[in-house]
């Protein structure tokens, strides 16, 4: 299982979805690391979409799981886009770990997206945050945003976001 709009975004951008299902255990879902690495190699994967924590299964990935996944992606030069919109919704006894905070090499190979929409129930304001630690990648991202015509900021969304986080 995965958040279904991921596949829609992939299709809308004329990209091909390479699916590696989670492994369903008796008590929790786990990541199929071997399957992911095999798919990366066999399918020439260049971008990995990570749902951290996972939606809809609710798994909060451990630091070791995230590092293992990151190590695989770094080894094969795969960019990780970590959707961390549900970071504030974790089970008691668990702690969300921001992917970019795992260390410099992980930060250099990722984009982290967050939003106040889930936590504060303000999805209608259509605002999100994109964190790109890698300067070169950030410049490329900004260039693509400009090229696509997203030059106008949502003023109400920014005010709502700022108020929610205060």
Protein language model regions, located:
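Substrate-binding/gating loop at the entrance of the active-site cleft, primarily
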Residues: 1-17
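PLP-dependent aminotransferase class I/II
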Residues: 109-166
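Active-site phosphate-binding strand-loop segment of PLP-dependent enzymes
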Residues: 22-94
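A short helix->loop->beta-strand "cap" motif at the edges of active sites that frequently abuts
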Residues: 15, 75-79, 107-108
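Structural detector of well-ordered beta-strand residues that form the stable sheet scaffold
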Residues: 18, 81, 111-113
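Hydrophobic/aromatic ligand-binding patch that stacks against planar heteroaromatic rings
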Residues: 8-10, 72, 102
């Amino acid at each position: 299982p995965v958040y279904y709009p991921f596949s829609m975004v992939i299709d809308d951008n004329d990209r091909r979805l390479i699916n590696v299902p989670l492994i369903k255990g008796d008590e929790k879902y786990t990541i199929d690391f071997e399957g992911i690495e095999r798919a990366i190699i066999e399918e020439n994967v260049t971008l990995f979409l990570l749902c951290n924590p996972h939606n809809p299964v609710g798994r909060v990935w451990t630091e070791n799981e995230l590092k293992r996944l990151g190590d695989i992606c770094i080894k094969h030069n795969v960019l990780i886009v970590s959707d961390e919109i549900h970071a504030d919704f974790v089970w008691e006894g668990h702690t969300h770990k921001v992917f970019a905070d795992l260390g410099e090499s992980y930060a250099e190979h990722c984009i982290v997206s967050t939003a106040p929409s889930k936590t504060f129930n303000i999805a209608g304001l259509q605002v999100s945050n994109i964190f790109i630690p890698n300067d070169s990648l950030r410049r490329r991202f900004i260039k693509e945003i400009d090229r696509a015509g997203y030059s106008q900021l949502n003023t109400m969304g920014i005010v709502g976001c700022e108020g929610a986080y205060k």
